[in-house]
């Protein structure tokens, strides 16, 4: 399968990075931080100024990049070249009624950086926000180029609220293009917790015309190229307390990171509509004629 798992972000650091250090040497070993990014297209369909923000988690086990995180200051504007990574984890939650701690299965989705660069060090939060709202910066503040294959059994889940708002959800399998430091692809790694597959499984959420096209063309096994951005959101998840003496329902906070396409290219195993088939045939014929000259 073709490989493309590339995410590029320019974002504002609004809170100091969390960096873990070796107890014996004091040297950084891993780090994490949130960057506030802005989506391209600062105006809505009515022409009103309407910036939209996302806050992806950046996480690394590369000591070199963890050390860089220590050097960053609040409000710094940082460039990060990354790939999207997914892990199954156990999230510890606490019942607000009986205060019992308990584990819940969860999916951790984050960006692991290949490079981190300080772009600007503005004077204060207002100046930092102004930099991000520069149209030239917003155009490239949150870019995701990913090739993946639809892997969930039910394929595309499509919803329409009958008010013109359509949405499609599906999961894709993405082969890693970059080496994730500390993974099985990193031959220097000996940490058992990092033994992982060479693919990641993010969810995709598309809207409007893209969602309509996804519904028509995608099935389980379809291969597509996504030109879009990483979309983050927070939500509440309901659960029942494990404590037999309690068993009360409660909510706990969750964070999600998904891919949202500006456009999709349907590559393989898709239900291509007739117009696309005709275009492919025409391109193929023209190529054959050129080859024959």
Model-identified regions with their sequence ranges:
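C-terminal end of P-loop GTPase domains and the immediately downstream helical coupling element
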Residues: 30-32
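The Walker A/P-loop phosphate-binding site
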Residues: 199
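Short, structured beta-strand/loop micro-motifs enriched in basic residues and often containing a Trp
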Residues: 56-63, 202-209
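Short, structured motif recognition centered on aromatic/hydrophobic residues
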Residues: 34-36, 78-80, 144-147, 169-172, ...
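Short, contiguous, well-structured surface segments enriched in hydrophobic/aromatic residues
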Residues: 39, 173-176
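Flexible glycine-rich surface loops and low-complexity tracts that mediate binding to linear polymers
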Residues: 75-90, 222-235
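Short, surface-exposed polybasic/aromatic micro-patch for ligand or macromolecular engagement
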Residues: 53
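Acidic, gly/ser/pro-rich intrinsically disordered tails
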Residues: 1-10, 14-28, 43-50, 67-70, ...
């Amino acid at each position: 399968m073709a490989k493309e798992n590339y995410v590029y972000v320019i974002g504002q650091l609004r809170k100091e990075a969390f960096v873990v250090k070796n107890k014996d040497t004091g040297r950084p070993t891993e780090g994490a931080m949130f960057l506030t990014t802005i989506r391209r297209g600062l105006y809505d369909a009515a022409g009103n100024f309407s910036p939209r923000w996302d806050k992806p988690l950046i996480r690394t086990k590369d000591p070199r990049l963890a050390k860089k995180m220590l050097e960053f200051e609040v409000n710094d504007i940082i460039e990060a070249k990354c790939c999207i990574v997914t892990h199954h984890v156990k999230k510890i939650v606490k019942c607000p009624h009986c205060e019992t701690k308990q584990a819940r299965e969860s999916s951790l989705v984050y960006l692991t950086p290949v490079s981190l660069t300080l772009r600007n060090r503005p004077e204060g939060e207002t100046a930092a926000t102004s930099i991000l709202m520069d149209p030239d910066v917003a155009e490239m503040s949150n870019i995701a180029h990913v090739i993946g294959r639809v892997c969930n059994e039910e394929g595309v889940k499509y919803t329409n609220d009958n008010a013109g708002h359509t949405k499609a959800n599906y999961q894709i399998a993405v082969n890693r293009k970059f080496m994730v430091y500390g993974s099985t692809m990193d031959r220097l790694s000996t940490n058992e917790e990092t033994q992982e597959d060479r693919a990641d499984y993010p969810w995709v959420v598309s809207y409007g015309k893209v969602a309509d096209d996804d519904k028509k063309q995608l099935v389980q096994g379809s291969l597509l190229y996504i030109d879009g951005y990483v979309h983050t959101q927070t939500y509440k998840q309901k659960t029942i307390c494990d404590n037999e003496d309690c068993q009360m329902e409660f909510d706990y906070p969750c964070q999600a990171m998904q891919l949202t396409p500006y456009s999709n290219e349907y590559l393989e195993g898709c239900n291509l509509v007739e117009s696309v088939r005709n275009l492919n045939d025409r391109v193929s014929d023209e190529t054959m004629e050129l080859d024959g000259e």
